[in-house]
């Protein structure tokens, strides 16, 4: 019999009836995972060159969040006021249909709305890398102090609390100057724009306008300054030549390695250089358009592989083991750190790709002249991108393994090695060996380390006697219930408030123990680089004495990280410090009169504690408050800075502590 005919309505009803059990209703208001925004991979000038135009415009993939025009989101607030032009630019609405429908506004040097989109995309991408590597939410540097409510009920003597800063402010057109900088007092990024010099260089338009906010290198660099200052607010205190250099170098490292997240760009450059990273390519250069627009510049602002010589010719950088000892300018010294990390990256890349090169070269190890296979390019680029991602996360994760003040490059090497051992106990791919080789090649060595083995470079585990172990157990018992509560919090402001209250309570807890005058507590604190007694120092035959230094608890944060091999790492970070203040009489060079100034000398420790067993202390990373060696080194360095004949006294910040770094002055380009 022929099949029975049914009406369309009956058929629809039949379909609905039989599919009811398997039909899954979808929420059409489901929030997307990511927001896609177009932007530049390199400086805008590369979009006007045939060789790079196809790879310079990329799509930034950042976590979705609710934003209002600006953009204004959970972490950032873009405020586009141009004081020099007396203009206020309309804020971009990233949720408008026209913007969403085309993955963001079209990249444009002349559209302020795109400028706002660009800075938002790059800074959010940078934040995402930090939060993934550190295993916790980012909280910006505090702005000011105010009263804690109900301080008496909480049992706190210190009634002051640091103010929560919800958003980092970004000003794309803040100044008409060849500068861009992070302002720690405003907790803001200020980007400038300026007129390029009249000489013809690269893709620049002589006399044209250069916007620093359109350089992803500059934006990522400044964002990293803000993040690093939020994680380690003592790293702006200029106590050693490495401090300012570390801020500069680390910010460049993040900007440089983030480039390797753009696979098409990496493939393009490797195809151009026959798969070699030690030849000239744009992957190892930062802020090219910015650098070429300045008077007497000959290329990128900074390069990790090579640089232009006086004749304008590009030459490869070769490691010099004596350069570190003889370089004192923060930019040049920071460039050494960048070159060291990029050297480790190149070593890893060569090591990981040698099998591919052998196969492609029939065992000779030398590829034939001409273009290499597109398949080989893709394989090489995949290795380069994977190595860069791992190395970037190692560099970021190491920040949690640094001492709280007076950072030196040797400390950072130990932090890198220790952080990676925790993340990947077996170094199958040679990351730690490559880092050690690169630091050794440039003469950068830690203090008081006998060998450069990974075992020697790993921060030591604490050695407590029975009584000291009991004292730490007492401290851990105080922390445990509160840390468990902190770990359950999701909202950033609540994390900030609760962690600072806990920090204040821990500070009071330790102070009471110190006031008790117990020798056991002094012995225990000495293992943490702290003291319960007055501090005495001698420098240049002058003695300095101060009462028991002020104790501060800077951080108590749980961290939940994922290592290279998928290993889960759960830890609690506790950062303690003390400040010794020594008065001394100095002559005012302007008036010739004697004045009293205060020498600040800090010490302290980063405690890394197992989250699963809070009474298990994994590392004590300290700078001893009673170290005469460190005190003497700091005094010598800061006195040399005050000698204008050395040309180093350019980084004091005016109204703040005269030994604090000024990022505005640090980044000034005449």
PLM features: residue spans?
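Acidic/polar low-complexity interaction segments
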Residues: 2-124, 128-132, 140-143, 163, ...
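Compositionally biased, intrinsically disordered low-complexity regions
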Residues: 41, 47, 72-75, 301, ...
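Zinc-dependent metallohydrolase catalytic domains
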Residues: 116, 123, 127-141, 152-188, ...
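Active-site pocket-lining segments that scaffold enzyme catalytic pockets across diverse folds
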Residues: 147-148
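Walker B catalytic acidic pair
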Residues: 222
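A short, surface-exposed beta-strand/turn
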Residues: 586-630
């Amino acid at each position: 019999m022929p099949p029975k005919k049914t009406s369309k309505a009956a058929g629809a009803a039949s379909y609905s009836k039989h599919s009811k059990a398997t039909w899954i209703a979808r929420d059409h208001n489901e929030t997307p995972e990511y927001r896609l925004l177009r932007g530049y991979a390199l400086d805008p000038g590369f979009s006007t060159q045939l060789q790079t135009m196809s790879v310079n415009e990329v799509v930034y993939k950042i976590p979705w969040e609710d934003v209002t025009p600006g953009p204004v989101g959970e972490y950032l607030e873009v405020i586009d006021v141009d004081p020099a032009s007396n203009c206020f630019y309309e804020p971009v609405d990233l949720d408008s249909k026209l913007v969403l429908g085309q993955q963001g506004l079209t990249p444009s040097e002349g559209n302020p709305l795109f400028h706002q989109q660009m800075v938002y995309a790059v800074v959010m991408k940078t934040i995402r890398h930090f939060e993934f590597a550190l295993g916790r939410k980012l909280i910006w540097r505090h702005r000011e102090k105010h009263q804690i409510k109900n301080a008496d009920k909480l049992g706190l003597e210190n009634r002051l609390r640091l103010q929560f800063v919800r958003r980092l402010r970004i000003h794309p057109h803040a100044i008409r100057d060849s500068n861009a900088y992070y302002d720690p007092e405003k907790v803001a990024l200020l980007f400038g724009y300026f007129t390029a010099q009249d000489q013809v260089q690269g893709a620049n338009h002589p006399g044209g306008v250069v916007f620093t906010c359109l350089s992803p290198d500059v934006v990522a660099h400044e964002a990293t300054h803000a993040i690093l200052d939020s994680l380690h607010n003592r790293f702006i205190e200029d106590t050693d030549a490495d401090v300012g250099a570390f801020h500069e170098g680390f910010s460049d490292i993040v900007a440089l390695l983030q480039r390797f997240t753009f696979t098409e760009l990496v493939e393009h450059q490797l195809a151009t250089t026959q798969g070699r990273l030690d030849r000239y390519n744009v992957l190892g250069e930062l802020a090219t358009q910015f650098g070429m627009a300045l008077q007497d510049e000959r290329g990128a602002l900074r390069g990790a592989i090579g640089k232009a010589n006086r004749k304008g010719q590009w030459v490869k950088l070769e490691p010099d083991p004596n350069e570190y000892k003889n370089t004192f300018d923060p930019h040049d010294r920071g460039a050494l750190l960048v070159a060291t990390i990029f050297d480790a990256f190149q070593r890893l890349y060569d090591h990981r790709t040698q099998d591919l090169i052998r196969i492609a070269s029939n065992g000779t190890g030398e590829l034939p002249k001409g273009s290499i296979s597109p398949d080989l390019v893709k394989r090489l680029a995949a290795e380069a991108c994977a190595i860069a991602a791992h190395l970037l996360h190692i560099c970021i994760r190491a920040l949690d393994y640094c001492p709280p003040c007076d950072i030196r490059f040797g400390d950072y090497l130990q932090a890198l090695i220790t952080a990676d051992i925790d993340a990947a106990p077996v170094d199958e791919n040679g990351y730690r060996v490559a880092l050690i080789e690169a630091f050794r090649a440039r003469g950068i060595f830690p203090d008081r380390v006998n060998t450069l083995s990974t075992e020697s470079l790993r921060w030591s585990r604490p050695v407590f006697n029975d009584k000291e172990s009991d004292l730490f157990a007492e401290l851990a018992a105080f922390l445990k219930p509160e840390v468990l509560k902190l770990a359950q919090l999701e909202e950033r402001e609540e994390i900030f408030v609760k962690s600072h209250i806990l920090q204040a309570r821990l500070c009071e807890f330790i102070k009471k123990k110190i006031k008790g005058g117990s020798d056991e507590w002094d012995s225990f604190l000495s293992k943490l680089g702290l003291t319960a007694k007055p501090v005495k120092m001698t420098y240049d035959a002058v003695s300095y004495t101060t009462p028991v230094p002020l104790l501060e608890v800077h951080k108590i944060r749980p961290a939940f990280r994922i290592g290279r091999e998928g290993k889960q790492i759960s830890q609690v970070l506790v950062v303690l410090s003390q400040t010794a203040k020594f008065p001394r009489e100095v002559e005012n060079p302007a008036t010739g009169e004697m004045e009293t100034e205060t020498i600040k000398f800090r010490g302290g420790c980063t405690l890394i504690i197992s989250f699963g067993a809070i009474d298990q202390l994994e590392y004590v990373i300290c700078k001893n408050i009673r170290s005469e060696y460190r005190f003497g080194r700091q005094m010598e360095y800061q006195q040399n800075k005050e000698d204008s004949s050395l040309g180093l006294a350019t980084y004091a910040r005016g109204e703040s502590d005269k030994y604090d770094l000024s990022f505005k002055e640090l980044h000034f380009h005449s």
